[in-house]
Design a protein with these regions (language model features):
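Beta-strand secondary-structure signal
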Residues: 92-94, 112-114, 145-147
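Short regulatory "switch" loops immediately downstream of catalytic or recognition motifs
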Residues: 35-37, 97-103, 116-119
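A broad structural signal for short, well-ordered beta-strand segments within beta-sheet-rich domains
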Residues: 95, 119-120, 155-156
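Short, charged cytosolic
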Residues: 1-6
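Structural detector for short beta-strands of small beta-barrel domains
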Residues: 84-107
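A membrane-cytosol interface segment of integral membrane proteins
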Residues: 124-162
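Alpha-helical transmembrane spans
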Residues: 7-81
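OB-fold (S1/OB) nucleic-acid-binding surfaces
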Residues: 105-129
């Protein structure tokens, strides 16, 4: 389901997002320092206000973009690394349900999936897994025997058994 190419693309996207946050913030902080130094040299009483405003804007811009753009991309990169190189566990059972609703699981958008590993109608044998919402929905019919390869409870691959 996941390939090394997916990880390379995610890391490239993370790099682009970091640049869009770091560069303008660094320019804003450099401008704030330049205004502060120029104000001290000219003994200006109001230069510190401009310097403070520039600093607040630069830091605010960075914090906003970090929370909205960088952190989700970083979380997805860690997720992909876990799926590709992390320890995986195989579980076999009956594919019981797939939720069309998207939920948040460890910062990632996911669909909930239910797999029954024991007696078909015994709810104590149900296992909940999470399917990455960025991947196409599984093309496996409900009630089919499946093999799920997972890291924690996030699905790395799912195949139908005959």
């Amino acid at each position: 389901m996941y390939t090394q190419q997916d990880l390379i693309q995610a890391l490239a996207q993370l790099k682009r997002r970091r640049l869009t946050a770091y560069l303008p913030s660094a320019v804003g902080l450099a401008a704030a320092i330049a205004v502060f130094v120029a104000g001290r040299i000219q003994r200006s009483d109001s230069a510190w206000v401009i310097s403070t405003v520039l600093t607040i804007l630069a830091v605010g811009y960075f914090l906003f973009l970090y929370g909205v753009s960088i952190k989700p991309a970083k979380t997805y990169c860690v997720f992909l690394q876990d799926m590709l190189t992390g320890r995986k566990r195989e579980t076999q059972g009956v594919f019981k349900s797939f939720s069309a609703d998207v939920c948040d699981r460890d910062g990632l958008p996911c669909h909930s999936l239910l797999l029954n590993v024991g007696q078909k109608d015994d709810p104590q044998d149900d296992r909940q897994f999470y399917w990455d919402a960025q991947m196409p929905n599984p093309a496996i019919a409900l009630g089919a025997q499946v093999k799920v390869e997972s890291n924690d409870n996030r699905i790395a691959s799912m195949t139908a058994l005959e």
